[in-house]
Amino acid sequence: MPVITAEKQPARKRILHAAAKLFLKHGYYNSSLKMIAKEANTNTGSVGWAFKAKEEILCELVTYVFDKQFETTEKLLEGITDDRVLFFAVEATLQLYMAEANEQVREMYNVSYSFSGSAKVIYNKMTEKLQEIFKEYLPQLKTKDFYEREIASAGIMRNFITVPCDMYFEMGRKIHTFHETTFLE
């Protein structure tokens, strides 16, 4: 990842904001760097100066969204419970509902799990969270074990996000099955 200088910071923020807006409106694949530059009120050269590629923009957005999802879950449960396992269940449930609510959000989740850079961000951040949440219940597991389990649960999450709810796989079943097949047996 390139060094982020103070002079690059305002441009990066504008570009990230523009990209997020376009990705949610048109989808990742239908949002070009040229469109992002126009929305950010800059040129494509500036986008290339701030980010090496569109996937790098995606990685930054994934990091931001990931942190915000966990922040939101913390706020939802604040004063209700300190149960970290319930925290995991609620966070996963939020992901499923958010993807079901909007096709561009579904695509963003799918794209994020598909590209190696953004998937790595998810795997690493989620491994930290899983270890933080489940270490007391699974003290024999090392970081690598949580990482392996995250790759498995990410595969399940990606597939559940990719397939919209239907008459055979409605949201309640999707949530229950995800929890049942990951850490919440």
Region spans (language model):
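C-terminal peripheral helix-coil segments that are non-catalytic and often amphipathic
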Residues: 131-140, 162-185
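A conserved mid-domain beta-alpha-beta active-site/ligand-binding segment of alpha/beta enzyme cores
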Residues: 143-148, 157-159, 173
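Helix-turn-helix
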Residues: 14, 18, 22-56, 60
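Anionic, Ser/Thr-rich low-complexity intrinsically disordered regions
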Residues: 104-111, 115, 122, 148-157
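Hydrophobic alpha-helical connector segments
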Residues: 60, 71-105, 125-127
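Solvent-exposed, amphipathic alpha-helical segments
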Residues: 14, 18-26, 72-76, 98, ...
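N-terminal intrinsically disordered/low-complexity leader segments
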Residues: 1-7
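Glycine- and acidic-residue-rich phosphate-binding/metal-coordinating active-site segment common to enzymes
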Residues: 111-136
